[in-house]
Amino acid sequence: MITSVLRYVLALYFCMGIAHGAYFSQFSMRAPDHDPCHDHTGRPVRCVPEFINAAFGKPVIASDTCGTNRPDKYCTVKEGPDGIIREQCDTCDARNHFQSHPASLLTDLNSIGNMTCWVSTPSLSPQNVSLTLSLGKKFELTYVSMHFCSRLPDSMALYKSADFGKTWTPFQFYSSECRRIFGRDPDVSITKSNEQEAVCTASHIMGPGGNRVAFPFLENRPSAQNFENSPVLQDWVTATDIKVVFSRLSPDQAELYGLSNDVNSYGNETDDEVKQRYFYSMGELAVGGRCKCNGHASRCIFDKMGRYTCDCKHNTAGTECEMCKPFHYDRPWGRATANSANSCVACNCNQHAKRCRFDAELFRLSGNRSGGVCLNCRHNTAGRNCHLCKPGFVRDTSLPMTHRKACKSCGCHPVGSLGKSCNQSSGQCVCKPGVTGTTCNRCAKGYQQSRSTVTPCIKIPTKADFIGSSHSEEQDQCSKCRIVPKRLNQKKFCKRDHAVQMVVVSREMVDGWAKYKIVVESVFKRGTENMQRGETSLWISPQGVICKCPKLRVGRRYLLLGKNDSDHERDGLMVNPQTVLVEWEDDIMDKVLRFSKKDKLGQCPEITSHRY
């Protein structure tokens, strides 16, 4: 099917002549009457630029041209009306417009009756003469057609580049001796495993094409019927430049002229006379194809910088519409197909961000629905879609999420709250002990305001809190408080099960016991109870309260060394005779870290049964 269609296109092209290519080139920039990239309902659909002769008017560079250094004489043989083959000679002079044969004539406007020809310098060994055509951007090509003004070359090769001539890939080889000239077996079968392999053939000499050689890019390629889903063939037909390299004009002179078998008929001629018949001459180099836009544009235009580029639709961008335009990264870019235009979709940032990125993992987890992640959310918003309020702000439900003031400040009291954050649903700030209110702006029932910024609200004392505190006989039972030692050493650290740095937040009396609310800030030794950072309680017995052993102050930091005590029924830590409490100072950190390191390495001093 593909082969017959290509042959039909080639036949139609040949019948109309080069003017057909000029026609499409002339109107390829004109905007269509309707947008082919959307159907009548506005739904995006695949669209492609018009089929044109991509070579028309494009520059061609020849490695060799006759008459460049000096006038050259070249001769051809033609069959006259009487059937007699006669030799006709002309002069090529690049300085004379009427006698010059530059490579630019290959892509100009030709007609069947007025064929202008490029001619190479006549030579006894005309090898490795090349023609390089630059298309200016990527095209998806259907065929390359070459119309020769003289006898067809015996051996030549077609190459393509997809990176503006930096690298070259062979397209097709032509030769009557493929193995000798190109080191390739002739007419190799193409399978799906070698669809990008260049084939060597002698069909140009043996076929009925006369002086024209045409190479259809997809002919005999197995995946041509499924081109949309074949990245291999899509790459195969993509090119920015085409190069033709002539390797051999003819195996021998007699074959060149199609004369009698008497190869010595020109034996008396000089080398200069013989070489006048050895040259390459081509009148037309045509390349049929479409501007490559990956199904996202119906035409190509010149941009403000003068570059030939696709007029991209479907929220795509790039010279070939090969990427999504900025802020349209909610889905991955894809080539448009007959079933899906694969339009790029804008990120959903609720109008709070101007930039976003694509996250493939999020896209997969969403069931291939959304993968956009908003960047630099503004207006105090946060989240991948700027759909949340950042810490310190809460949603104003009276306004839509797209409003620039959709997130308002929590307004947490700087003294009564533990931070600036609040509950995203209720707006409730996190209050310090004894503080209440949505913004933590007042003392709770049973508490009174203090002058401390650490504990702004303290519990109002009751008579029960002071029972027994004035009994002198109990005070007489108090001895020296060993819980607060004069100095801290390695042995004390090693004998205790846990070691933490804590800050005292509040104090209250419960049945004669002093209950301190503390926050463990650092853990140097966890013990079997697996001490963790965070809020907990520290209990001091009634006797310790009376004796003020230890004497703790709200807002101060301490180093607490203790033994595991799971017998008591109170939650938190218990101060007992084995507890060591040292008020935290700046120079204590290094000492504690040193003790902790030795303890972990088993370098503790020998421990006796003495209590300390």
Curated annotation (Swiss-Prot):
SUPFAM superfamilies according to UniProt: EGF/Laminin, TIMP-like
Residue ranges of domain Laminin EGF-like in the record: 291-346, 347-409, 410-459
NTR domain sequence ranges: 478-604
InterPro entries noted in UniProt: EGF-like_dom, Laminin/Netrin_ECM, Laminin_N, LE_dom, LMN_ATRN_NET-like_EGF, Netrin_domain, Netrin_module_non-TIMP, TIMP-like_OB-fold
Segments traversing the membrane: none
Signal peptide location: 1-21
Highest taxon of the lineage: Eukaryota
UniProt KW keywords: Basement membrane, Disulfide bond, Extracellular matrix, Glycoprotein, Laminin EGF-like domain, Neurogenesis, Repeat, Secreted, Signal
Listed GO MF terms: signaling receptor binding
Positions of disulphide bridges: 117-149, 291-300, 293-310, 312-321, 324-344, 347-356, 349-374, 377-386, 389-407, 410-422, 412-429, 431-440, 443-457, 478-547, 494-604
Deletion phenotype: Defective gonad distal tip cell (DTC) migration whereby DTCs migrate towards the midbody of the hermaphrodite on the ventral side rather than the dorsal side of the body resulting in ventrally located gonad arms. Double knockout with mig-38 RNAi results in failed gonad DTC migration to the midbody of the hermaphrodite.
Pfam families on file: EGF_laminin (PF00053), EGF_LMN_ATRN (PF24973), Laminin_N (PF00055), NTR (PF01759)
GO CC annotations on file: axon; basement membrane; cytoplasm; extracellular region
Domain notes per entry: Mutations that delete the second laminin EGF-like repeat impair only dorsal migrations of mesodermal cells and axons.
Binding partners and assembly: Binds to unc-5 and unc-40 receptors.
Record's protein name: Netrin unc-6
Native source species: Caenorhabditis elegans
Gene: unc-6
